[in-house]
Swiss-Prot record:
Highest taxon above the source species: Bacteria
Membrane-traversing stretches: 11-31, 51-71, 72-92
Organism name: Staphylococcus saprophyticus subsp. saprophyticus (strain ATCC 15305 / DSM 20229 / NCIMB 8711 / NCTC 7292 / S-41)
Pfam family, any one: PhaG_MnhG_YufB
GO annotation, cellular component aspect: plasma membrane
Protein name, as recorded: Putative antiporter subunit mnhG2
PANTHER family the UniProt entry points to: ANTIPORTER SUBUNIT MNHG2-RELATED
Region spans: Disordered: 125-148
Keywords linked to the UniProt accession: Antiport, Cell membrane, Ion transport, Membrane, Transmembrane, Transmembrane helix, Transport
Amino acid sequence: MQITSEIVNLIAAIMIFLGSIIALISSIGLIKFQDVFLRSHAATKSSTLSVLLTLVGVIIFFISSQGYLSVRLILALVFINLTSPVGGHLISRAAYRTGAYMYRKSDAPRQTNILLSSSENNTFEQLKQRAHEREERRRKTYEKEHDY
C-alpha cells in the first residue's frame, strides 16, 4: 500500500511539474511573439493545458494523501478550461475586426488566393482587392501605434 501511494504521489508531482513547464513555455511565447494573434494563441493553448495538468496533479495528490476530493479544484478546472479558450478567441476576433497588425515573414500579400467571403456574388478580383485593403489598414494601424 505504501508503494502504491508513493507511485501515485510521483505521478501527481510529474503532472504538476509538466504543467509548470508548459506555463513557462507559454510565458516565453507571450514575450517572444510579435503580434496579438500569436500571443493570444500562446496564452490560451498552452496555459489551458498547463492549468489542466497542474490541477489534475493537485487533485490526484489530495485524493492519495488526504483522502478527499476537492470540489473547488474541480470547479476551477472546469471554469478555466471553458473560459480561457473563449476569452482568447474573443480577443483575437476583436483584434482582427479592428485591423490589428499581423506579423508575417514575407512581403507577399496575404489571403489573395483564399475566399474571404461566403458571398457568391464577389469575383476573385474583388476578394483580392478587399484583402489588399484590409492588409493596408492593418499596416497603417500598426505604424500609427508604433510611431513609424
